[in-house]
């Protein structure tokens, strides 16, 4: 059985500000990242719209159900993420961290499986996570804003927030936006 579900994805890439961002070669980064990730899990899983949080290396993917949360409330979580970052850097001054963030939205196909206790209950088919990873890798290598919205996420934002957003950027034919720089 297949079900369509509107979702949003927050993709984060956590990096050490001054040191190498590798868990094995930089134990201070591992400690900072672990603290940040634990605080993030405790805060975000309380929200009814949070479906899943995945971590791979220094990347974190947060999947939101758009039936339970709107784009504006998901964008508000950026403030929570930034607050957790400040707390992490205060507790781990030897390895301060920063992040890049990409927000994406779209329809995900969920395929229910006949499962036993060892198999997953469902498979989510979507290219949204792959697209966010491509944008994260592009903005991580250059002087771009640390937060980007794909066009699909941008369309869901209210007009009052769209007024604060500037011209588009293009990565691998993916249109993205960011906030206007402060003067």
Regions found by a protein language model. Give the residues of each.
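Switch/connector loops and helix/strand junctions flanking conserved nucleotide-binding motifs
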Residues: 109-113, 156-159
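Catalytic-core segments of nucleotide cyclases and related cyclic-nucleotide turnover enzymes
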Residues: 75, 111-140
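A short pre-motif secondary-structure segment
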Residues: 51-55
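Alpha-helical scaffold within the catalytic cores of cyclic-nucleotide enzymes
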Residues: 31-50, 62, 66-101, 105, ...
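Juxtacatalytic helix/coil linker segments
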Residues: 1-49, 182-183
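Intrinsically disordered, glycine/charged-rich C-terminal tails and inter-domain linkers
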Residues: 1-2, 120, 131-134, 140-183
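A generic structural signal for short hydrophobic patches within well-formed alpha-helices
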Residues: 17-20, 60, 153-154
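Catalytic cores and conserved motifs of cyclic dinucleotide signaling enzymes
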Residues: 69-72, 110, 123, 144-147
């Amino acid at each position: 059985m297949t079900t369509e579900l509107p979702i949003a994805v927050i993709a984060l890439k956590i990096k050490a500000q001054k040191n190498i961002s590798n868990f094995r070669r930089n134990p201070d980064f591992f400690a900072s990242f672990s603290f940040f990730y634990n605080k993030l899990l405790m805060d975000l899983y309380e929200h009814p719209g949070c479906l899943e949080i995945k971590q791979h290396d220094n990347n974190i993917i947060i999947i939101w159900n758009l039936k339970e949360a709107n784009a504006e409330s998901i964008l508000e979580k950026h403030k929570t993420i930034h607050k957790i970052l400040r707390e992490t850097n205060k507790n781990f001054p030897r390895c301060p961290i920063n992040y890049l963030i990409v927000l994406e939205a779209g329809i995900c196909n969920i395929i229910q499986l006949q499962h036993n206790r060892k198999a997953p209950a469902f498979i989510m088919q979507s290219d949204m996570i792959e697209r966010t990873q491509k944008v994260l890798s592009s903005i991580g290598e250059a002087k771009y804003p640390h937060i980007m919205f794909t066009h699909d996420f941008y369309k869901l934002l209210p007009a009052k927030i769209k007024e604060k957003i500037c011209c588009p950027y293009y990565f691998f034919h993916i249109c993205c936006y960011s906030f206007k720089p402060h003067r």
